[in-house]
Amino acid sequence: MKQKPEDWLNDVPDNQEDDEDDEIIWVSKSEIKRDAEALKDLGAELVDLGKNALEKIPLDDDLRAAVELAQRITREGRRRQLQLIGKLLRARDPEPIQIALDKLNNRHNQQVALFHKLEQLRDRLITEGDDVIPEILALYSHADRQQLRSLVRNAQKEKAANKPPKAARQIFQYLRELAETTN
């Protein structure tokens, strides 16, 4: 006996009915490979970190040991160790590790931006002289006007005499100290 199409739709058992909660999500093989490669790259970033930076990353003992071993290995062994680190990361939630790495990178970027700002202030101090000092005093209220003026005068003399920029380095160091005590 042949069933009409309408009949076989009604014959679906209760346990096979479509539930929106039980929706199956199909992931392509290429997407799985991309995710695995991204985790391997995350592992490579961990391996490239220094010892102090690595301590700030939340890793369990197995993963930390694998990363420390990969830091000591070279060439083909390192590649295989990176594969293992990627495998270990697939078994864990990589999000806290990625967040900690992003914080480390962001802190480094902020420090570089601060150094560029301080270098620009130093250059302006040397070229414009006393006109920039009130701006620095506004930024860093605990700055010593007299010391700044002395350093600026010395830097301008060195620049005019084509001497090495010893005073310019001292200005930068003083500005960096001011910035560190402010933060």
UniProtKB/Swiss-Prot annotation:
Pfam families: DarP (PF04751). It is found in: Cytoplasm. The keyword Cell division does not apply. Gene3D superfamilies: PSPTO4464-like domains. Its main location: cytoplasm. One of its GO terms (molecular function) is ribosome binding. Residues 1-21 are annotated as: Disordered. Member of a network of 50S ribosomal subunit biogenesis factors which assembles along the 30S-50S interface, preventing incorrect 23S rRNA structures from forming. Promotes peptidyl transferase center (PTC) maturation. Belongs to the DarP family. PANTHER family: UPF0307 PROTEIN YJGA. This is Dual-action ribosomal maturation protein DarP. It comes from Pectobacterium atrosepticum (strain SCRI 1043 / ATCC BAA-672) (Erwinia carotovora subsp. atroseptica).
